[in-house]
């Protein structure tokens, strides 16, 4: 990021948390690259439409897509700021243990394009220690 330019933001996970976050950041004038593993979600967003129920989000997404500030893809792209907003469902162990595998997979993908000075934000609901584990996974790359 240079001087007075807006940071480029990459939001990983375009569901109930990620898509509104991406749209609001884009409304502020930052170019946003949204990432989702589901191609139909990507295609829907790139048409300026939404795949979730959220009051007034449809108009906001349409506006920022039309302005060229929000683009979606299935691949992570270099950015100045990364927001990880992927699911953390319960594992199928019967103990309600959070499954952080989506977070760790996203962190490993971010590590592939991360450069000095970038910021990584974990927005996903996660148990204590997940941020440190994510940091360690990124540092190991």
PLM regions: where:
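Conserved N-terminal Rossmann-fold NAD(P) cofactor-binding segment
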Residues: 2-8, 31, 37-81, 85-98, ...
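Glycine-rich Rossmann-fold phosphate-binding loop(s) that bind the pyrophosphate
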Residues: 14-15
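N-terminal Rossmann-fold NAD(P) dinucleotide-binding loop
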Residues: 18-19
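Gly/Ala-rich phosphate-binding loop of Rossmann-like dinucleotide-binding domains
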Residues: 22, 26-27
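Rossmann-like NAD(P)(H) cofactor-binding subdomain of soluble oxidoreductases
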Residues: 90-141
């Amino acid at each position: 990021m240079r001087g007075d330019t807006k940071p480029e933001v990459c939001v990983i996970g375009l569901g109930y948390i990620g898509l509104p976050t991406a749209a609001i950041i884009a409304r502020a004038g930052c170019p946003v690259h949204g990432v989702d593993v589901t191609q139909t979600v990507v295609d829907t967003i790139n048409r300026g439409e939404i795949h979730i129920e959220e009051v007034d989000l449809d108009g906001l997404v349409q506006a920022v897509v039309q302005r060229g500030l929000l683009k979606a893809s299935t691949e992570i792209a270099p950015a100045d700021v990364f927001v990880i907003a992927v699911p953390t469902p319960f594992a199928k162990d019967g103990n309600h243990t959070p499954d952080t595998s989506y977070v760790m997979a996203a962190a490993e993908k971010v590590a592939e394009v991360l450069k000095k000075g970038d910021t990584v934000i974990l927005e996903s609901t996660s148990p204590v220690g997940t941020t440190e584990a994510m940091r360690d996974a990124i540092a190991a790359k």
